[in-house]
A protein has these predicted regions:
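Glycine- and acidic-residue-enriched helix-capping/strand-helix junction motifs
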Residues: 23-38
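Glycine-rich beta-alpha loop elements in corrinoid/cobalamin-binding modules
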Residues: 44-164
Length: 164
């Protein structure tokens, strides 16, 4: 795995939140659910000087719709997927489509499914890293080390494709 080096520039991260449990639902009627985990990650990264945005998915997206929303958000160094077990099949598609739009983006996955079965998530094509457990400080360390051009593969709670 080639390490991502931001050459002193703070990281730009997009957090993707598939906020639906029923794959057949047309659309959530409300504004969706609040994710304390993603809010905490966003706050810690922003306090560290990094740029963070959210792509809040309130319903299952087609390839065309997902890619359109992704492009509308702009370009990022890192895209993080919050993966519950019920959303894992959809996230596999979202990750594939993300890599088709931004082939060089670094993809990190976290949340419940990643903590329960990290090897299954890490085996998905396009996934660079999986966070097991709370992600605020491991992801801050990841972003800081990318900014500094340092090796980040020893960051606690993060597992990479080349790990045994």
């Amino acid at each position: 795995m080639e390490l991502k080096n931001l050459h002193g520039r703070k990281a730009r991260m997009l957090l993707v939140y598939p906020d639906y449990t029923d794959r057949d639902c047309a659309r959530k009627m409300s504004g969706g659910n609040y994710s304390e985990g993603l809010a905490s990650i966003s706050a810690v990264l922003k306090q560290g000087g990094h740029h963070v945005e959210l792509l809040h998915l309130l319903n299952l997206h087609t390839e065309e719709d997902f890619k359109k929303r992704l492009r509308e958000k702009g370009e990022f160094d890192i895209i993080g997927f919050s993966i519950r077990t019920t959303a894992f099949p959809d996230c596999q598609n979202y990750i594939k489509w993300t890599k088709e739009v931004y082939p060089d983006v670094f993809i990190i996955c976290g949340s419940y499914h990643c903590t329960l079965v990290p090897d299954e998530v890490l085996a998905v094509d396009g996934v660079d890293c999986v966070c097991v457990g709370d992600g605020e400080y491991p992801e801050l360390e990841l972003c800081d080390k990318m900014t500094a051009g340092e090796d980040y593969t020893d960051t606690k709670s993060l597992y990479f494709k080349n790990d045994d």
